[in-house]
């Protein structure tokens, strides 16, 4: 969050500088006469064409006259404004279209094509599942009732996927789209007023941002001074960056979780078959965890985007595009600050969703967390370098546990010092910087045998 704060502060300073420079160009009366003549020539196309023709016919005498200079600048500014408006309209239209329709549909089609390529693997897993189930039934072993239910469900799901993959995939895609549409659809406020959904709000905001950037680009084109035009373009770039960042982040929270859920549900039967193998059940647990995480992000992100979009639309004034012409400083600051604030509020949703996901995992699967390599090595390192309790050493006496030799020498100290961090030993081993920690020696926990204190008779000293 510190990096985001620095970025927000830099954007705020840039908004202040650009808006102040643009405001100075608006309030400066020294360039009013030249700017007015250029604007008049831009509006009067017939007079401008006459002046340009006269200047081109007699370039030696009329090239340096103010009328020729103003006519050329008016034509260049008009061409520049047309190019800027066309590029801005095309950029925002392409962005809105890609985020609204093209990108999700293409990704869903790619997921369907990927899952269809796995159909031979599904056939193989279906055959293996049927053979294992038949062998378990013929072996006449006592199985719990839930085992039969689980195997029956697995056989039904995998067989349906293998026999009709297109129907299964179309059902998954349609179901995820219905859930996403219900979450991002219109909602009703507490006072009974109906609000607009997340996607509709994004479409409206994209149109507003396009109008803002077009207004600033038009001001840059209308300004005859190149320095002031650069300031106007800087304001347009700041507004476009902040609004585009909000649009991209909000659209990603609306689209990406649904695509991940579609992919995980499409590959779900392959992970369900792994429940038959105890050594591979952790993969199924990882699949379930990823599915729950994607569902949590879908359930929290989509309503949050709709709510923040509605709040942002209500906070922005109605005549903001017209204010850019008279007060660019406050208008640029207002638009950029509101967009950046909404973006930061969406970014704070990520740790919240992670906390909810962790709580759900602890509640639903308390024993699903498998101790990985890092945890196993941490436990081994803690056992290896743990000091011996004083009470146990005193109770054992001079006899070391597991040996029958009476020796009062203490146990040798470990060759390596204890790591400063629990995962240090595993990290060194994983990175190849140290050998694997030796396994813990199994010691005999039986008590040491009591010494034989019986008095044996002396043998007589015979001559």
UniProtKB/Swiss-Prot annotation:
It comes from Bordetella parapertussis (strain 12822 / ATCC BAA-587 / NCTC 13253). This is Type IV secretion system protein PtlD homolog. Residues 441-455 have a biased composition (Basic and acidic residues). Keywords: Cell membrane, Membrane, Signal, Transmembrane, Transmembrane helix. The chain crosses the membrane at residues 118-138, 232-252, 253-273, 294-314, 333-353. Residues 376-463 are annotated as: Disordered. InterPro entries: Conjugal_tfr_TrbL/VirB6. Residues 376-410 have a biased composition (Low complexity). It comes from the Bacteria. It is a multi-pass membrane protein. It is found in: Cell membrane. One of its GO terms (cellular component) is plasma membrane. One of its GO terms (biological process) is protein secretion by the type IV secretion system. Residues 411-420 have a biased composition (Pro residues). Residues 1-24 form the signal peptide. Pfam families: TrbL.
């Amino acid at each position: 969050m510190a990096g985001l704060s620095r970025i927000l502060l830099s954007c705020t300073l840039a908004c202040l500088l650009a808006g102040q420079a643009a405001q100075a160009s608006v309030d400066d009366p020294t360039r009013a006469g030249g700017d007015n003549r250029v604007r008049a020539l831009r509006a009067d196309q017939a007079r401008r064409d006459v002046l340009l023709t006269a200047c081109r016919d007699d370039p030696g005498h009329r090239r340096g006259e103010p009328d020729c200079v103003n006519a050329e600048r008016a034509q260049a500014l008009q061409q520049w404004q047309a190019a800027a408006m066309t590029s801005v309209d095309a950029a925002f239209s392409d962005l809105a279209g890609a985020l609204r329709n093209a990108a999700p549909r293409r990704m869903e089609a790619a997921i369907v094509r990927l899952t269809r390529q796995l159909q031979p693997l599904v056939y193989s897993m279906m055959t293996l599942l049927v053979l294992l189930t038949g062998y378990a039934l013929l072996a006449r072993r006592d199985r719990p009732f839930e085992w039969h239910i689980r195997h029956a469900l697995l056989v039904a799901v995998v067989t349906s996927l293998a026999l009709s993959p297109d129907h299964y995939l179309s059902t998954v895609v349609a179901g995820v789209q219905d859930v996403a549409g219900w979450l991002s659809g219109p909602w009703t406020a507490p006072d009974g007023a109906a609000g607009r959904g997340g996607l509709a709000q994004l479409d409206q905001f994209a149109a507003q941002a396009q109008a803002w950037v077009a207004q600033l680009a038009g001001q840059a084109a209308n300004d005859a001074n190149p320095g002031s035009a650069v300031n106007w373009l800087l304001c347009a770039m700041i507004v476009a960056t902040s609004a585009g960042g909000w649009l991209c982040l909000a659209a990603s929270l609306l689209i990406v979780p649904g695509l991940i859920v579609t992919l995980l549900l499409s590959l779900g039967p392959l992970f369900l078959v792994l429940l038959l193998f105890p050594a591979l059940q952790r993969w199924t647990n990882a699949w379930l965890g990823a599915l729950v995480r994607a569902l949590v992000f879908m359930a929290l992100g989509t309503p949050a985007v709709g709510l923040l979009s509605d709040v942002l639309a209500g906070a922005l004034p109605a005549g903001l595009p017209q204010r850019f012409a008279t007060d660019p400083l406050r208008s640029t600051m207002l638009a950029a600050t509101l967009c950046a604030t909404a973006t930061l509020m969406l970014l704070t949703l990520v740790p919240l969703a992670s906390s909810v996901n962790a709580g759900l995992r602890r509640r639903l699967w308390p024993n699903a967390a498998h101790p990985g390599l890092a945890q196993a090595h941490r436990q081994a390192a803690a056992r290896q370098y743990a000091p011996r309790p004083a009470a146990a050493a005193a109770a054992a006496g001079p006899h070391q546990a597991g040996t029958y030799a009476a020796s009062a020498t203490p146990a040798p100290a470990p060759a390596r010092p204890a790591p400063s961090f629990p995962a240090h030993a595993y990290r060194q081993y994983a990175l190849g910087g140290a050998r694997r920690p030796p396994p813990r020696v199994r010691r005999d926990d039986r008590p040491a045998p009591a010494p034989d204190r019986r008095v044996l008779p002396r043998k007589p000293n015979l001559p």
